[in-house]
């Protein structure tokens, strides 16, 4: 008879980690979106199956905590059909998503399954939805500009390959229009887009009207609409990040877009409050502010490829001190502020240049580029300073040379800042026009 030490390591590891006895529990309490069940041996993050004895229900749920020897679970689907007779069977595994080249052009739900209920080919690999960010010392430095094809960003808010930036805007600020332009024009190999908490009507409209066949060809969409359970909406961000990590591991340059972090945080808030966490700032429990860096730190450069990430944040009443906006801005490497005033004036992309910043721009652009961008910012700031005087007819030409220059060039500057949604501007072309504007 073989002893355990004589069995090969990989087989021994599987035997030790496996459950040789099937464990089943039973639902003991349902409160809102939270289930309680007695299920010995389960772990936080583990998936369990919920089944009724008459096979009228088959649903997955995730363990999110424990209370008085009972497991707290959040279902990954609708609660209808759960009863006091519902059995809980642990799977012994955490949530994983199937990844591979076959995902390009696909629209997935928040759990990584086909949005239309169809079937996907056999995946090349399985990636855990929750995993650690790359170690800080293993990350490559951000040294290369990434052309996003948007003049105002490439010229004045240059984004580096592997950088993480936030797009902050109120409702109607032009976020979706900007995201569609980025998908079409960014010089990357793969784009992964997570649409979290969007209205169902807007999803197909965005795919067919804004994104188009060309944009979808090199993209993967993860969609969790506003009517989906909170766990699916929260998981959508992690699923999209895992898919982006797979393509990064294949040596590709990946653009990860998430719309929006605010709705992701609201889903996390629902889960945290259901689990009994105390509400803190604006009703958000502590787990929300722990989840944000855990999600965002996974983007960036690795030794093989890169994930450049842009996260949209809904700002209520232009309040940048709102908890989610404030926390997100402190985590990311830059912020792009969209202005409702510019959007109302049909100025797209509606980016408020003077309130926006890229924290790595000075390290990745040439000395000349830095000078031209600084000169244009000064002209915009000077024009904003004298704009009210111009409107009331009190400005006297000749009193301020720089103000005269700003007034003279503002038309050309605004023309350069505006860009059609289907208009592509290459990086070198953007720099040439920027140089012309500031000479």
From Swiss-Prot:
GO BP: any one term: protein secretion by the type III secretion system
Keyword Transport found: yes
Disruption phenotype: Deletion mutant secretes neither Yops nor the ruler and needle subunits.
A GO molecular-function annotation: ATP hydrolysis activity
EC number(s) reported in the record: 7.4.2.8
Keyword Cell membrane part of the UniProt annotation: no
Binding site for ATP: 172-177
GO CC term (a single one): cytoplasm
Gene3D superfamilies: 3.40.50.12240
This protein's UniProt keywords: ATP-binding, Cytoplasm, Nucleotide-binding, Plasmid, Protein transport, Translocase, Transport, Virulence
Record's subcellular location: Cytoplasm
Xref: PROSITE patterns: ATPASE_ALPHA_BETA
Reaction it catalyzes: ATP + H2O + cellular proteinSide 1 = ADP + phosphate + cellular proteinSide 2
Stated regulation of activity: ATPase activity is negatively regulated by YscL/SctL.
Top EC class for this record: translocase
UniProt cross-references to SUPFAM superfamilies, sorted A to Z: P-loop containing nucleoside triphosphate hydrolases (SSF52540)
Primary localization class, coarse: cytoplasm
Family classification: Belongs to the ATPase alpha/beta chains family. T3SS ATPase subfamily.
Function, in words: ATPase component of the type III secretion system (T3SS), also called injectisome, which is used to inject bacterial effector proteins into eukaryotic host cells. Acts as a molecular motor to provide the energy that is required for the export of proteins. Required for type III secretion apparatus (T3SA) formation, proper protein secretion, host cell invasion and virulence. May play a critical role in T3SS substrate recognition, disassembly of the effector/chaperone complex and unfolding of the effector in an ATP-dependent manner prior to secretion.
Subunit structure: The core secretion machinery of the T3SS is composed of approximately 20 different proteins, including cytoplasmic components, a base, an export apparatus and a needle. This subunit is part of the cytosolic complex. Forms homohexamers. Interacts directly with YscL/SctL (stator protein). YscN assembly requires the presence of YscC/SctC (the secretin), YscJ/SctJ (the outer inner ring protein), YscQ/SctQ (the major sorting platform component), YscK/SctK and YscL/SctL. Interacts with the Yersinia outer protein R (YopR) in a secretion signal-dependent manner.
Protein name per the record: Type 3 secretion system ATPase
Organism expressing this protein natively: Yersinia enterocolitica
Lineage, opening ranks: Bacteria, Pseudomonadati, Pseudomonadota, Gammaproteobacteria, Enterobacterales
Gene: sctN
């Amino acid at each position: 008879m073989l002893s355990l030490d004589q069995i090969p390591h990989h087989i021994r590891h599987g035997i030790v980690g496996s459950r040789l006895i099937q464990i089943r529990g039973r639902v003991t309490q349902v409160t809102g979106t939270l289930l309680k069940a007695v299920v010995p041996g389960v772990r936080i993050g583990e998936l369990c199956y919920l089944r009724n004895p008459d096979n009228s229900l088959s649903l997955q749920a995730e363990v999110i905590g424990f209370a008085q020897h009972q497991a707290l679970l959040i279902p990954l689907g609708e609660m209808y059909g759960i009863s006091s007779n519902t059995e809980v069977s642990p799977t012994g595994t955490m949530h994983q998503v199937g990844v591979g080249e076959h995902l390009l052009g696909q629209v997935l739900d928040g759990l990584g399954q086909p949005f239309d209920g169809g079937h996907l080919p056999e995946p090349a690999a399985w990636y855990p939805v929750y995993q650690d960010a790359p170690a800080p010392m293993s990350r490559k430095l951000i040294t290369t500009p990434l052309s996003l094809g948007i003049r105002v960003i490439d010229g004045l808010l240059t984004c580096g390959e592997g950088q993480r930036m936030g797009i902050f805007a109120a409702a109607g600020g032009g976020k979706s229009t900007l995201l569609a332009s980025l998908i079409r024009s960014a010089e990357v190999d793969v784009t992964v887009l997570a649409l979290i908490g969007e209205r169902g009507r807007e999803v197909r409209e965005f795919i067919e009207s804004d994104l188009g066949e060309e944009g979808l060809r090199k993209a993967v969409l993860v969609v969790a609409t506003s009517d989906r359970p909170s766990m699916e909406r929260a998981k959508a961000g992690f699923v999209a990040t895992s898919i982006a990590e797979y393509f990064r591991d294949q040596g590709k340059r990946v653009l990860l877009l998430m719309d929006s972090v605010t709705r992701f945080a609201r889903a996390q808030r629902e889960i945290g409050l259901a689990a009994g966490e105390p509400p803190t700032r604006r009703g958000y429990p502590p787990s929300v502010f722990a989840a944000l860096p855990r999600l965002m730190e996974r983007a960036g450069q690795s030794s093989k490829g890169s994930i450049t990430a842009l996260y949209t944040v809904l700002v209520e009443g232009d309040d940048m001190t709102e908890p989610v906006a404030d926390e997100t801005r402190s985590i990311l490497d830059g912020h792009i502020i969209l202005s409702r005033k510019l959007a109302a004036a049909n100025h797209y992309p509606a980016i408020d240049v003077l309130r926006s910043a890229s924290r790595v721009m000075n390290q990745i652009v040439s000395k000349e580029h830095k000078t031209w961008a600084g000169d244009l910012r000064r002209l915009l700031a000077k024009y904003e300073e004298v704009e009210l005087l111009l409107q009331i007819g009190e400005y006297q030409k000749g009193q301020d040379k720089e103000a005269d220059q700003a007034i003279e060039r503002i038309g050309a500057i605004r023309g350069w800042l505006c860009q059609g949604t289907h208009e592509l501007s290459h990086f070198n072309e953007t720099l040439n026009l920027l140089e012309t504007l500031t000479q």
